[in-house]
A protein has these predicted regions:
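Conserved, structured core segments of small domains
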Residues: 1-100
Length: 100
């Protein structure tokens, strides 16, 4: 079975609310047997359009056992309750990619 990866690129505009989201999301990921590969950290953009608000830009990569597990997590009642909190604290893109 191929692993799946959540990739999120978000610009945080409410750090307090985003930190509240970050603290709560961990338990939902642990329950889905997922793990963080990247959680923030230093970014070095090498190509493409320059992103505004570098200090508030976050990249997150999470590994899931499969695409099915990733989708089940995203649609789970535990995570659905956190989506609104994340969206109120940050704007960005969230997508899944299947690994090889």
């Amino acid at each position: 079975m191929r692993k799946a990866y959540l990739i999120a690129e978000v610009t945080v505009h409410d750090m307090e609310a985003y930190e509240h989201y970050r603290q709560q999301v961990v338990a939902t990921l642990e329950a889905a047997d997922a793990r963080f590969l990247v959680r923030g950290g230093k970014r070095m953009q090498m190509e493409g359009a320059d992103e505004a608000h570098h200090d508030n830009l976050r990249t997150v990569i999470v590994e899931f056992p499969s695409m099915e597990a990733a989708l089940a997590w995203y649609e789970s009642p535990a995570y659905i309750t956190l989506i609104e909190l994340r969206q109120s604290a940050a704007d960005g893109r969230v997508f899944f990619v299947e690994g090889t």
